Amino acid sequence: MQALVMLLATGATYYLGLLAAAAAAVNPGRPNTPGSLPAHRRQKRDWIWNQMHIDEERNDSLPHYVGKIKSSVDPKKTEYQLRGESAGKVFRVDKNTGDVYALERLDREKISEYHLTALVVDKDSKKNLESPSSFTIKVHDVNDNWPVFTHRVFNASVPEMSGIGTSVIQVTAMDADDPTVADHASVVYQLTKGKENFDIRGSGLIVTMNKHLDRETQDKYEVVVKAEDAQGRRGESGTATVFITLQDVNDNFPIFTQNRYTFSVPEDIRVGSPLGSLFVEDPDEPQNRKTKYSFVQGEYRDTFTIDTDPSHNEGIIKPIKPLDYERIRQYSFTIEATDPTIDLRYLGSTSPKNIARVIINVTDVDEPPIFQQPFYHFQLQENQKKPLIGSVLAKDPDAAQRDIRYSIRRTSDKGQFFGITKKGGIYNDKELDREVYPWYNLTVEAKEVDLSGTPTGKESIVQVHIEVMDENDNAPEFAKPYEPKVCENAPQGKLVVQISATDKDITPRDVKFKFSLSTEDSNFTLIDNHDNTANIIVKYGYFDRERAKVHHLPVLISDNGRPSLTGTSTLHVTVCKCNEHGEFTLCEEAAAQVGISIQALVAIFLCILTFTVITLLIILRRRLRKQARAHGKSVPEIHEQLVTYDEEGGGEMDTTSYDVSVLNSARHGGAKPPRPALDARPSLYAQVQKPPRQAPGAHAPGEMAAMIGVKKDEADHDGGGPPYDTLHIYGYEGAESIAESLSSLGTDSSDSDIDYDFLNDWGTRFKMLAELYGSDPQEELVY
C-alpha cells in the first residue's frame, strides 16, 4: 500500500494546489494496467508530506494550526504522535486527526526551523504501523525588528581643510529580519546632528560637506546618525554618536611675540654660547612647527647665527666670533621667521613672512692683555750673545690701557739661557750651540699692572720660537768608523779602503771636502776622488807584519765653509797574513780604547760602599765582645740576666742584686774565679753563699749577719764607687705582714739576732729565701 503526502497550512491556498498535484501523481486509487504492477505485489506505504510552514509572531489565539499529517492506514486503528526536542513543548499533534498545532508564538529571529519526527502507531498495542518520518516546520519572517548599530559610539578623524566629499568613517546598523524576504532587512541612514558640516551616504559612509574645517577654530565635532527600517511595522529606528577629530596640517605661519628684542651680553662671551632667544607663536601642533630664522639683507650674519630649538621652536642667537666692546658696542639687525614646510594649498591671506628687530648691547669686561701676534719666531746666530734677539708686544684691550710686564715661564732648562726686559725684548745670557739645541721654545707671559705696579690678575701667554742659525764651527770627520785591513804582501796600488766625511754643521748641497795625509813617509797614499770621498791605496807594496801589525794613518779633512775648517781623523790599518787568494788568514786588530761608562762606575762605587759597611759591622761586633770580657762575663752569663716571670721573686730588680758568676761558681763547689787584672774597680756584687752545714741543734745566724754587715760597711765607706741601691719589692710586705718589712733599706748590722727559720713556714713563695737564710742541716746544695 502506498502512502499519501499532504501539506496543509491555514490561509495558504497555494499549498492546496501543490497537494492536489502530488495526490494526482501518486494516487493509490488509480487503476492498475496489466503491465504496470504485478497483481500479487504489495504496495509500500509512505508519507505524503515532509514540510510545513507558519508565520512568526501571529496575534490570533493559541494554539495556532500548522498543518496535518495523514496516513493511508485505517484511521480507526491509528494514532499520531510527534517526537523531537520541541514536541510537546512548542508543537503538539491531534492523535486522531493528525492536525499539528503551535502551542506558543514563534520568533524566527530565535529559531527559524524546527525538525520533528512523525509516528503512526496502533491505538491498542502502541506499535509502529509505519516507519518514523522526519519533517520540518519553517517559520516565515515578518518585518518586526528595527536596525541596531554595531557600536553606540564611533570615533573618527579627518585632516583639517579637507575637500568636500572626503571620507570620514563607515558606520553600520544591523536588522535581525530575514534579508531574503522583500525589504525586511533594508536600512536607511540619516544625520540628525552635524549635517551642516558632514553628510552620510546610503551605505553608511560619512563624508565632509565643508572644506573650511579649521582645527585651530574647532578641533572636535559630534555627529548623530539614525538608522531606520522603512518597511517596519512600528517605525522604530536606532541611533549612534560619531565623534570626529580634525587632524592638524601645517597651515599656519610663525609670528613673533614681540616686534623688538633687546639683549645685553659681555664682550668675553664664549663663541657658540647662547646669548638670547627669539619666541614665535605657531598654532599648529609641535610636529608641524618648523620655524626657520634668517637675517634680512645679510646683516651681521658673519658675527651671529640663529639656531632653531626643535623642542620649543624658539630661535637661539649665538656669536660665531669674539665680540669686542672697544670696536663695536651695539649690534642692530632684522630677523625674519618663516616655515619652509608649510602646505601652500591651505595658505590664505596670512603673510608667509614675519620680521622682528634685534638689538644686542655689548658690555665692557676687563680683559687680559692681547699679543700682537699669535706666536713669534726669531733667529739667532750660534756662538753669539745678543742684547736683543727680538721683541714681543702685548696691549691692554680695555679703555684703561694698563701697563704690561713680561716674564719667561721656566718650564724647562732651556729657558735659563734667555731673559726678557720690561718692554718685551728677549736676549740670551749664554752662547748657544746649534749642534746641542737647534730650537728653543719659550713661553712668554704678559701681566697687567696698575699704577702702583701691582698685578691685576689679568695675564696672557704666547709661544716664542727661537731658531739657532748654524755657522761653520765644527771640523769634518769620518762619516763612520773604519777598520781597514791589508795583506802583508799587498802589491803597490792595492786599494785598502774608501773613506768619506761628514760635518756636524749644516752641510749645504755644494759642500766639498778635501782629503790629504798629514805625513807622506808611510807605505800608504791618498787619492782624493773630488766627490767627497777618497781612496787609501798601498804606496810601495809589501808590509813587514813583525815590525808593525797596525799602522796609524792621520787623515786631514777640510771643508769649504767660511772660515774653512780642517779636522784630523786617524785611520788604523791592520796588517794581516793572507793566503795565495788574497784572503785574510790571521789578523790582530788594533786594541780598542778602554773606557768605563758612568753606569759601571756607579756599580763599582756601590760594591765598595757595601764592603765598607760590612767591615765596620764586623769590627763593631768584635769590640763589643771585648767589652763584655772586660766586665768578666761570658756570653752565656750575660744571657742569664734574662728574667723568667713564672718564678717568684722581686721582679726585674732581682737582676741587680746578685752576681751570676758567683752563683755558678758556688753551684759547682768552687770559689768565684778571680777578676782580670784590668778590672781594678771594686766589685758591686755580693758573694752570696749559704753558711756551711752545722751540726744538729747548732744555730749560727750571726755569721750571715756578720757577712751582710761587712758588705754594707764596705759599700758605705767606698768613696770611689758609685751609689748602688737596690729596692726589693715583695707581694706581701709591710706592717700587716707576719714578718713585717723585709726590705734591706732600713736594716743595719743589728739584725744578727734574727731567726730566719720561720721562712720555711711561709710556703713555696718564700722557698728561695728560706734556702738562702735558713740553716737546714739536710740541704746539700750551695748557692
UniProtKB/Swiss-Prot annotation:
Q: Matching InterPro entries, A to Z? A: Cadherin, Cadherin-like_dom, Cadherin-like_sf, Cadherin_CS, Cadherin_Y-type_LIR, Catenin-bd_sf
Asked whether the keyword Signal is assigned, the reply is yes
* A Pfam entry, by short name: CADH_Y-type_LIR
Q: How does it sit in the membrane?
A: Single-pass type I membrane protein
Give the binding site residues for Ca(2+) 2.
56, 109, 141-142, 144, 177
SUPFAM superfamilies referenced in this protein's UniProt entry, alphabetically: Cadherin-like (SSF49313)
Signal peptide residues are: 1-25
- Cytoplasmic domain ranges by topology: 621-783
Stretches the record annotates as Required for interaction with PALS1: 621-660
Q: How is it modified after translation?
A: Phosphorylated on tyrosine residues by KDR/VEGFR-2. Dephosphorylated by PTPRB. O-glycosylated.
Subunit description: Part of a complex composed of AMOTL2, MAGI1 and CDH5, within the complex AMOTL2 acts as a scaffold protein for the interaction of MAGI1 with CDH5. The complex is required for coupling actin fibers to cell junctions in endothelial cells. Within the complex AMOTL2 (via its N-terminus) interacts with CDH5. Interacts (via cadherin 5 domain) with PTPRB. Interacts with TRPC4. Interacts with KRIT1. Interacts with PARD3. Interacts with RTN4 (isoform B).
Q: What is this protein called?
A: Cadherin-5
Look up and give the organism this protein is from: Bos taurus (Bovine)
